[in-house]
Amino acid sequence: MQDSPLIIGSRQFQSRLLVGTGKYKDLNETDLAIQASGAEIVTVAIRRVNIGQHADQPNLLSVIPPEKYTILPNTAGCFDADSAIRTCMLARELLDGHNLVKLEVLGDQDTLYPNITETLKAARTLIDDGFEIMVYTSDDPIVAKELESMGCVAIMPLGSLIGSGLGILNPHTISIIKENAKVPVLVDAGVGTASDAAIAMELGCDGVLMNTAIAAAQHPVLMASAMKKAIEAGREAFLAGRMPRKRMANASSPETGYFFK
């Protein structure tokens, strides 16, 4: 079965795995892990890494060149709408008018849970200014629909807390978000290992964004390769359609044509 491409806003992609750039030991490991992941979209925390705003520091774009990858600036570290909006404006300036961004407005330092009120405020302003918004949000289906209705091009509910590795804690609500959405739904945050990524895709999600699950692994490049395979396997399983769950056994061997009677 031929799969359709992942379409986000005005762009389309073959890979459904999106990766971050934080927590690697150096730029070489970052480069190798991203290559092993097969990702086409690479997200960058504008407030934390250098993509040209500091001429005297190593530039991350030397290992993720914009001509090879779609750079997805994100607003990690922003705790109010105003700082998130300013960060997106800076990203557009540094990336020569690039308007696809990942919006995340955090509620507190301990949970890094999304502040929905400030997220909605920032999203409205940025969309009015021509940005294409991929938005980090809770797994609340009502909030997800509101963000879609205002014009966000992708909804990104958390699987569990950022960097926790706890996996997909509320698969039912994420399934509801996906069933109700007319834009891509990508799990963002909480993935810890390959099985978590596969589960997200089996739920019908359009993709998964991850960073710590790869960067904090004992062997990040190998984990990146595992995640690539998990995304592909989970997607194929979803397209294939799983067997129905049953309460009782159902023998797989035929019940007719026995040699012995």
UniProtKB/Swiss-Prot annotation:
Subcellular location: Cytoplasm
Keyword Phosphoprotein listed: no
CDD domains: ThiG (cd04728)
Family annotation (InterPro entries): Aldolase_TIM, Thiazole_synthase_ThiG, ThiG
EC number(s) reported in the record: 2.8.1.10
GO biological process, one term: thiamine diphosphate biosynthetic process
Active site: K102 (schiff-base intermediate with dxp)
Top-rank taxon: Bacteria
Gene Ontology molecular function: thiazole synthase activity
Subunit (UniProt): Homotetramer. Forms heterodimers with either ThiH or ThiS.
Family, per entry: Belongs to the ThiG family.
Protein name: Thiazole synthase
